[in-house]
Amino acid sequence: MTITPAEALTRCIEHREIFHDEMLHLMRMLMRGEMSPQIASALLMGLRVKKETVGEITAAAQVMREFATPVVTPNPQDLLDMCGTGGDGSHTFNISTTAMFVAAAAGVPIAKHGGRSASSSSGSADVLEALGANLTLSPEQVAECIQATGIGFMFAPAHHSAMKNVAPVRKELGVRTIFNILGPLTNPANAANQLMGVFHPDLVGIQVRVLQRLGSRHVLIVHGKDGMDEASLGSATLVGELKDGEIREYEIHPEDYGLSMVSNRGIKVANREESRELVIQALDNVEGVARDIVALNAGLAIYAGNKTDTIGQALSLAFETISNGSARAKLEEFCAYTRKFQK
């Protein structure tokens, strides 16, 4: 079923849903550059004001995946993505990027999808470059890196070239649109497992249901009640879990796992160099907030990656992986391997 952009805009104004096939059609028009900037911006704002539904987001994510340049691996059902929507305004160091080295050292194969800073002080690509990684890898080289080191990093702009057709509209609008929540749903390696941080509590229930419809295996969507798009030490964390096709929503607290509840002030950074320092401190097992929040998020990733039966077991494994030096060694191994491909 097709729908014109004008008809879709009328639906948004009347707070009525755009159906799945209609949303597929509209997204394909957007990704092919077949809408004028005026109509595209009106539609994106209409969806935002109406509030995007699970069905609309699912259809949009399917189209973005359709247009993406894929990374082909033998076992996508075992891969884990760790990323956040960003936009939480917390300006903390790159927690999930650090945690991926811990999870990988614990045996979880990582296919991380990320980019440069949009609203934070340091995006995942920014800090990985500061740590010495080469990110200009072809899809085949990313797949090789996953096979060899247990980690692959997919630089989002390199895999979503069709986004160039909506980039000027997004930039001029300067506010969040559906695309801010689509990035973490469109992993080019089709990773079936995921730890995703979200900037708003409402997105916990929404994103977990979208990934259920998209066929994910084991997913944890997290939002710190202090506003972080990570599991937080400064508050309880809301969790939406998809496992074996079933969804559960609950809260976790640092004290549940023997961690102290502490402010996140000590892990705020102004640039990628400051973020790099905290990454190294955490992986070098320097006691403090940076190490503990990395361990907490790595524990959730290890659990989402199906290495343990409980979050508690996964957190113990995360601390062990940091303290025995294997997480820091994984960082060095990954960076060295990516540099093999430098021209």
Curated annotation (Swiss-Prot):
Anthranilate 2 binds at R170. 5-phospho-alpha-D-ribose 1-diphosphate binds at residues 84, 87-88, 92, 94-97, 112-120, 124. Keywords: Amino-acid biosynthesis, Aromatic amino acid biosynthesis, Glycosyltransferase, Magnesium, Metal-binding, Transferase, Tryptophan biosynthesis. Anthranilate 1 binds at G84. The gene is trpD. The lineage of its organism: Bacteria, Pseudomonadati, Pseudomonadota, Betaproteobacteria, Burkholderiales. Catalyzes the transfer of the phosphoribosyl group of 5-phosphorylribose-1-pyrophosphate (PRPP) to anthranilate to yield N-(5'-phosphoribosyl)-anthranilate (PRA). GO terms for cellular component: cytosol. Belongs to the anthranilate phosphoribosyltransferase family. This is Anthranilate phosphoribosyltransferase. It catalyses: N-(5-phospho-beta-D-ribosyl)anthranilate + diphosphate = 5-phospho-alpha-D-ribose 1-diphosphate + anthranilate. InterPro entries: Anthranilate_Pribosyl_Tfrase, Glycosyl_Trfase_fam3, Glycosyl_Trfase_fam3_N_dom, Glycosyl_Trfase_fam3_N_dom_sf, Nuc_phospho_transferase.
